[in-house]
């Protein structure tokens, strides 16, 4: 059972809500943080012109195997190449799966389970990137 900040983190991660200092900060644009829908069309176009498409972006994931909880700083891989790190993660009480946010530096594919993995406690586990929030899936 979780309580205090642990319950806050679990609930926000399950819902797909980012946290300032983890998934949101002054060095990421709203588009990188996955919040482009809050930005007006004119500013969105300006941001896209100013920043290349290969900038890191915040994405939501779930671990596809029984695994320890994903934690901040754990590496995400595409094949053998590191493509990013976890910014927030937990085990979901709803599904029993590891879920979280990661900052990745490459284009990723949603709902593909063959390509991606996470390194947790010296072992790789398969993961899948998905739309935010397991309660909305």
Q: What spans do the regions from the language model cover?
A:
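Conserved, structured C-terminal
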Residues: 1-137
């Amino acid at each position: 059972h979780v309580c205090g900040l642990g319950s806050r983190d679990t609930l926000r991660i399950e819902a797909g809500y980012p946290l300032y200092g983890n998934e949101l900060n002054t060095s990421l644009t709203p588009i990188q943080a996955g919040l482009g829908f809050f930005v007006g069309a004119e500013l969105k176009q300006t941001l896209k012109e100013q920043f290349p498409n290969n900038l890191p972006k915040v994405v939501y994931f779930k671990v596809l195997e029984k695994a320890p909880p994903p934690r901040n700083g754990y590496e995400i891989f595409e094949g053998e190449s590191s493509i990013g790190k976890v910014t927030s993660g937990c085990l979901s009480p709803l599904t029993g799966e590891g879920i979280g946010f990661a900052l990745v530096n490459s284009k990723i594919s949603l709902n593909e389970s063959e390509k991606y993995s996470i390194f947790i406690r010296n072992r790789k586990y398969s993961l899948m990137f998905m739309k935010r929030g397991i309660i909305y899936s």
